[in-house]
């Protein structure tokens, strides 16, 4: 308690009033801190909104450029289909370039980024990817001779390292055939020449009977000798035996062999070499 003298007022500090003032100060400080926090948060959100707006604007521009490029590609495809009516499997690279030139002349300069797509398209194209596929094994033509061998054409050439193999020759060579025939004929002629003396010795016609031995009458007249009687019987049976004809001798001489030269003994004896 403070006492003032004279005409001064007597003032006294109340503790409740002091507590009330302290609370007000604390509330003011807390409100200020809260306002500052909200302000900082609002500033951060505003900056984030501005960055998002910039990104959105860039994306809108990119979408517009892509839409313009898509429209240009659609017009190019339409003009290409009208100028070059062909299938995708049978397209060719030179015709494709001509169509692209005509399409560029009709459509004018393309949008931004068209050259990069064009270069990528040319990089992915290969020389043999657009040409029509050739048949693997061409069949025989009706006007070709059946005796000639058809040589299969190489299909789908993969590179310079791949070499077409020559066709296998099915028919035997005439030189080998002639040599084989000559050797077989020489062997058969040598066999015929070896067998000819034995055949002539076996199939020789019976010789005519010689003149009677001077002792024949003596042997036949002596009935006491049995060996002479046996020899006379053999001679008589040989005389009464009929002689074989020439055709029969030829039939005996000819051997039933499948080889054609056995039927001609003159050719077999001459030993003809082919």
Curated annotation (Swiss-Prot):
Keywords: Activator, Differentiation, DNA-binding, Nucleus, Transcription, Transcription regulation
Region (Basic motif): 20-41
Keyword Cytoplasm: no
GO MF annotations, alphabetized: DNA-binding transcription factor activity, RNA polymerase II-specific; RNA polymerase II cis-regulatory region sequence-specific DNA binding
CDD domains named among the record's database cross-references: bZIP_BATF (cd14701)
Region Leucine-zipper, residue ranges: 45-66
Assembly with partners or alone: Heterodimer; heterodimerizes with JUN family proteins.
Family, per entry: Belongs to the bZIP family.
Record's protein name: Basic leucine zipper transcriptional factor ATF-like 2
Organism expressing this protein natively: Homo sapiens
């Amino acid at each position: 308690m403070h006492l003032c003298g004279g005409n001064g007022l007597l003032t006294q500090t109340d503790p409740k009033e002091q507590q009330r003032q302290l609370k007000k100060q604390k509330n003011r400080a807390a409100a200020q801190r809260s306002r500052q926090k909200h302000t900082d948060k609002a500033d951060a959100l505003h900056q984030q909104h501005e960055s998002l707006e910039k990104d959105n604007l860039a994306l809108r521009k990119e979408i517009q450029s892509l839409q313009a490029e898509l429209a240009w590609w659609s017009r190019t495809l339409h003009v290409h289909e009208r100028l070059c009516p062909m299938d995708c499997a049978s397209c060719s690279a030179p015709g494709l370039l001509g169509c692209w030139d005509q399409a560029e002349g009709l459509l004018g300069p393309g949008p931004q980024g068209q050259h990069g797509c064009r270069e990528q398209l040319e990089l992915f194209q290969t020389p043999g990817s657009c040409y029509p596929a050739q048949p693997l094994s061409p069949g025989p033509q009706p006007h070709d001779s059946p005796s000639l061998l058809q040589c299969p054409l190489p299909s789908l050439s993969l590179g310079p390292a791949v070499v077409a193999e020559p066709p296998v020759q099915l028919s035997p060579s005439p030189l080998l055939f002639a040599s084989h025939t000559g050797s077989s004929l020489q062997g058969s002629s040598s066999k015929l020449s070896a067998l000819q003396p034995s055949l002539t010795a076996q199939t020789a016609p019976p010789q005519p009977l010689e003149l009677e031995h001077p002792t024949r009458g003596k042997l036949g007249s002596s009935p006491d000798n049995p060996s002479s009687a046996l020899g006379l019987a053999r001679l008589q049976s040989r005389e009464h035996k009929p002689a074989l004809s020439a055709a029969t001798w030829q039939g005996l001489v000819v051997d039933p062999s499948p080889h054609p030269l056995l039927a001609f003994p003159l050719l077999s004896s001459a030993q003809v070499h082919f």
